[in-house]
Design a protein with these regions (language model features):
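Glycine-rich phosphate-binding active-site loops on the catalytic face of alpha/beta enzymes
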Residues: 35-45, 78-91, 123-153
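Glycine- and other small-residue-rich loops at beta-strand/loop junctions that grip anionic moieties
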Residues: 14, 34-35, 57, 92, ...
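N-terminal active-site wall of soluble small-molecule enzyme domains
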Residues: 1-51
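Structural motif corresponding to alpha-helix initiation and N-cap regions
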Residues: 19, 39-42, 62, 97, ...
Length: 161
């Protein structure tokens, strides 16, 4: 299934990022891996691959972002949950959109991807506050018209894929 998803993403020129499973990401030659604070260390991941690999790191505190900002192995931060989410069991406390702005004002320069309860009506403000991208699940999976919702999210976020 992962290979089918990877191939579909490549067909549309969209990076295929695997969440938390480093072995799977390397085995199927995914475009990237996203890990949390308590998952495989990013230095270990980078050392295990000899090909370009996008590495994302979950952040929900300023001190985590400051640590990650200094690690060359990290390509982007997943910031969240921004809003309450039902897609994850036992999510961390919500951060709110202003946390993105807080990170930017603190000098965080790596790309920030907002995740957690993000809906279409949030996208423009998140971008205004400094988010480089968004990650969604229910905004698409629970939409009445998946194609239209996906198109609207892409347009609002400035995505050209």
């Amino acid at each position: 299934l992962a290979i089918k998803c990877r191939d579909l993403c490549r067909q549309y020129n969209v990076p295929f990022i695997v969440d938390d499973n480093v072995d799977l990401a390397l085995e199927i030659e995914a475009d990237g891996i996203h890990v949390g604070q308590s998952d495989t260390p990013v230095k270990t991941i980078r050392a295990r691959t000899h090909k370009p690999l996008i590495i994302g790191w979950s952040v929900n505190r300023l001190d985590e972002a400051k640590i990650g900002e200094e690690l060359s192995e990290i390509d982007y931060f997943g910031i969240g949950p921004i809003f309450p989410t039902q897609s994850k069991e036992n999510p961390k406390p919500t951060l709110g959109m202003a946390f993105i702005q807080t990170l930017r004002k603190a000098g965080i320069t790596k790309p920030l991807v907002a995740i957690g309860g993000v809906k279409l009506e949030h996208v423009k403000t998140l971008r205004k506050y400094g988010a480089d991208g968004i990650a969604v699940i229910t905004a698409i999976s629970q939409a009445k018209d998946i194609k239209a919702s996906t198109k609207a999210l892409k347009e609002a976020s400035g995505c050209n894929h």
